[in-house]
Amino acid sequence: GVGCSSGCHKVGGQCRCG
C-alpha cells in the first residue's frame, strides 16, 4: 500500500512485511 515498502502491506496503521 501507499507508504509501505515493496512486498509490504499496511496493518493497524503500520507497514508489515513477510
Curated annotation (Swiss-Prot):
It is found in: Secreted. One of its GO terms (molecular function) is toxin activity. Keywords: Amidation, Disulfide bond, Secreted, Toxin. It comes from the Eukaryota. Expressed by the venom gland. The modification Glycine amide is found at G18. Disulfide bonds join C4-C15, C8-C17. Its main location: secreted. GO terms for cellular component: extracellular region. Belongs to the poneritoxin-Ae1 family. This is U1-poneritoxin-Ae1e. It comes from Anochetus emarginatus (Ant).
